[in-house]
Curated annotation (Swiss-Prot):
ABC transporter domain location: 354-590
Protein name: ATP-dependent lipid A-core flippase
Subunit structure: Homodimer.
Location of this chain's protein in the cell: Cell inner membrane
């Protein structure tokens, strides 16, 4: 993942307003919270006025507080001040509850919506996006970055609204009491604004670095956990310890830099505010005039209440910039154009005829042509095998048929219709695919077979698919049979067992086109014998594209395409190609059962 340049980065305000756009579904709750914070903020000046009455009451406790108000004209300061303090506290508590609770509902709902949208977005992004971004950074966005957004959407909004309104109420009261003295406080606002702006830029820049560093930590941990067998088998513990230590230390250093910025910035801001307070107190004493002691105490009290909300408003800049940096990376992903689907054709069924005409392909962002002028045809029910060394383009060709990538030139037709013209979901319903990299989910055996569109399939159909894949023999020995949990990515199963479940999933789909990408490469000899028998049966009536390096699979193909450097260099049946004594014959002489890197 790369950083956007500062010049290209959208402004913090624009990002934050976009983030707040997610508040719209909760606008009524948001308005209630604002009313609550208004109530809370209004109580701050009241405390200053209470002190005024208290000080004035020291010299005349029997003075009447509301001489012109009916029913209250006999209420003396002696009774009024304690009563008002209790009422103000209750009023403040009500405001605090309404503000905090309803804003929390808004903020948590906002973050939930954002997290769900981010995850759903991952499901529709094109394959090339996953090719360019490692899984650690993608996971970090959903976990760590969204957590940063939570801070900006909860604590930050609360502080901005509550403390911002408090500052407004206090300034309004100070202006009302003595506008000339209040101008002294106003004079420092430009300096405070400059300090906040400078610190905000630093906080945002550092926050982006922290989130990238956290993505590195997640990536290293994820790779090590997923590949723990390789780590232990090859003695990689020390290497992985060093790699994780470096990633974690980098994240720690960046966190400390941000903490240091805040540790310097906050005391400097406090020094400016309290310097203004010192000047203000001098002027209050020097220019007392005819004001009473209560007036002076009230004014100083209200002025003394200002530094706390101003300081909190300045400190919230760090939280906001963390959230803005997190939101920027989230919106960067959300703004990526999803997988393009311009197709209009939908068919309930297809016969499975496959025609590839003059197909060429280059991966986006690269210059090397992976496929060059590929042409062949497969009749319904036929089996075609792709053979060639690693990197010859076999898997790329297989991935273009279900439109995991969009081809540059040429055509791929299913039943005479270009695959780009099919609606994406409809196209993929007609294709079943099994690869050497089996993906199982942390769920039951049955749910892994009946996955996605297959969910809800009758139990007997699931059992039949498992039997046809020769998986029922080991499933029957599991503690709960089909209802046994397989663990993360099927960790509780052997490689052959995992592969058979993947094949059972493809069998249950019952699609007319079948793509087997090294589908038996992870199986032992006994397992392969069972699977091969099952595949022989299931391939009847289905168009099958097989990428394989085992002779037992290839020799039964109706057509073998021999690929090298993205081109078809030979084609024909097994016997025909051997008779030609060419490239395929040399591969066969090397042993088609050799390791995949030699021939696949």
């Amino acid at each position: 993942m790369t950083d956007s340049s500062p010049a290209a980065s959208p402004s913090s305000l624009k990002i934050y307003f976009r983030l707040l756009g997610y508040v719209r579904p909760y606008i009524s709750l948001f308005l209630i919270s604002i009313v609550g914070f208004l109530i809370f903020a209004s109580t701050q000046p009241m405390l200053g006025y209470i002190l005024k009455y208290f000080v004035d009451g020291l010299s005349n406790p029997e003075a009447v507080l509301f001489p012109t108000v009916p029913y209250l004209r006999d209420l003396q300061l002696l009774q009024a001040v304690p009563l008002l303090i209790i009422l103000i506290a209750a009023w403040q508590g009500l405001g605090s509850y309404l503000g905090n609770y309803f804003l929390a509902k808004v903020s948590l709902g906002l973050v939930h919506d954002l997290r769900v949208q981010l995850f759903n977005n991952l499901l529709v992004l094109p394959n090339r996006y996953f090719d360019k971004h490692n899984s650690g950074h993608l996971i970090s966005r959903i976990t760590f970055n969204v957590t940063m957004v939570t801070g900006a959407a909860t604590d930050a909004i609360k502080v901005v609204i509550r403390e911002g309104m408090t500052v407004i109420f206090l300034f309004a009261s100070l202006l009302f009491m003595n506008w000339k003295l209040t101008l002294v406080m106003v004079a420092i606002l430009p300096l405070i604004a400059v300090m906040v702006r400078t610190a905000s830029k630093k906080f945002r820049k550092q926050s982006k670095k922290i989130q990238l560093a956290m993505g590195d930590v997640t990536h290293v941990a994820s790779e090590t956990i997923q590949g723990y067998r390789v780590v232990r088998s090859f003695g990689g513990e020390a290497y992985e310890e060093k790699r994780f230590l470096d990633a974690s230390q980098g994240n720690t250093d960046k966190q400390l830099r941000m903490t240091r910025t805040g540790a310097i910035y906050t005391p400097l801001l406090q020094l400016v505010i309290y310097s203004a307070m010192a000047i203000l107190m001098f002027l209050v004493l020097y220019l007392r005039g005819d004001a009473s002691a209560g007036d002076m105490v009230a004014y100083i009290t209200l002025a003394g209440l200002l530094p706390k909300p101003i300081r909190q408003l300045s400190e919230v800049s760090s939280t906001i910039q963390k959230g803005v940096a997190g939101a920027e990376s989230i919106f960067e992903q959300l703004d990526v154009e999803p997988e393009v689907d311009t197709g209009t054709v939908e068919r309930d069924s297809v016969s499975g005829r496959l025609d590839v005409r003059n197909l060429s392909f280059t991966y986006p962002g690269t210059e090397r042509q992976v496929l060059d002028d590929i042409s062949f045809s497969v009749e319904p029910g036929q089996m075609v095998a792709l053979v060639g060394r690693s990197g010859s383009g076999k898997s790329t060709l297989a991935n273009l048929i279900p439109r995991f990538y969009h081809h540059d030139k040429g055509e791929i037709l299913i039943d005479g219709v270009e695959v780009e013209q099919y609606k994406l979901l409809n196209l993929r319903r007609h294709i079943a695919q099994v690869t050497q990299h089996v993906t199982l989910f942390s769920d039951t055996v049955a749910n892994n077979i009946a996955y996605g569109d297959l969910a809800g399939a009758p139990r007997e159909d699931i059992e039949k698919a498992a039997r046809d894949a020769y998986a029922m023999d080991f499933i029957a020995q599991l503690p709960e049979g089909l209802d046994t949990q397989v663990g993360e990515n099927g960790v509780l199963l052997s490689g052959g067992q995992r592969q058979r479940l993947a094949i059972a999933r493809a069998l249950l789909k019952n699609a007319p086109l079948l793509i087997l990408d090294e589908a038996t490469s992870a199986l032992d000899t006994e397992s392969e014998r069972h699977i091969q028998a099952a595949l022989d049966q299931v391939m009847k009536g289905r168009t099958t594209l097989v990428i394989a390096h085992r002779l037992s699979t290839i020799e039964k193909a109706d057509l073998i395409l021999v690929m090298d450097q993205g081109r078809i260099v030979e084609r024909g049946t097994h016997d025909d190609l051997l008779a030609q004594n060419g490239y395929y014959a040399r591969l066969n002489a090397m042993g088609l059962d050799a390791p995949a890197e030699d021939i696949a």
